[in-house]
Amino acid sequence: MPTINQLVRQGRKKLTEKSASPALKGNPFKRGVCTVVKTTTPKKPNSALRKIARVRLSNNIEVTAYIPGIGHNLQEHSVVLVRGGRVKDLPGVRYHIVRGALDAAGVANRMQGRSKYGAKRPKAGKK
């Protein structure tokens, strides 16, 4: 417990909030180039092969980003758009790749939640 004199001299320190996605440096999105595209397994109790990519951002920071949706066309040297957002069951993955932007194609045959996966509106006759 500080004394009144200590508070007069120094005051209370403001707690600064830590960013969930520090590599974006306050930007909503950053462009980057894939250096590695691979799959990894989630932590217990889940089981899958999650698609991830190591991405070197335009500010030269390298991050691990998740590739959402079923199937993708990304490979080494693909240029992608990265947004914040962690994947709860993949430790160290704090970013998502934006589907349908730059070299990342949208998810094929996606009917619901299309805007999150860069899928175009299907033709009226097709069901």
UniProtKB/Swiss-Prot annotation:
Q: Does this UniProt record's set of keywords contain DNA-binding?
A: no
Q: Where are the transmembrane segments?
A: none
Task: Give the record's keywords alphabetically.
Answer: Methylation, Ribonucleoprotein, Ribosomal protein, RNA-binding, rRNA-binding, tRNA-binding
Q: Which Pfam families match?
A: Ribosom_S12_S23
The protein's name: Small ribosomal subunit protein uS12
Q: Which family does it belong to?
A: Belongs to the universal ribosomal protein uS12 family.
| Location of 3-methylthioaspartic acid modifications | 89
Q: Which organism is it from?
A: Symbiobacterium thermophilum (strain DSM 24528 / JCM 14929 / IAM 14863 / T)
| InterPro entries per record | NA-bd_OB-fold (IPR012340), Ribosomal_uS12 (IPR006032), Ribosomal_uS12_bac (IPR005679)
Report the NCBIfam families cross-referenced here: rpsL_bact
Fetch the Gene3D superfamilies from UniProt. Nucleic acid-binding proteins
Task: Give the protein's biological function.
Answer: With S4 and S5 plays an important role in translational accuracy. Interacts with and stabilizes bases of the 16S rRNA that are involved in tRNA selection in the A site and with the mRNA backbone. Located at the interface of the 30S and 50S subunits, it traverses the body of the 30S subunit contacting proteins on the other side and probably holding the rRNA structure together. The combined cluster of proteins S8, S12 and S17 appears to hold together the shoulder and platform of the 30S subunit.
Q: Name one GO biological process term.
A: translation
Disulfide pattern: none
GO CC: one term? small ribosomal subunit
A GO molecular function assigned to this protein is: rRNA binding
Annotated region (Disordered), positions in chain: 1-25
Its assembly, as annotated, is: Part of the 30S ribosomal subunit. Contacts proteins S8 and S17. May interact with IF1 in the 30S initiation complex.
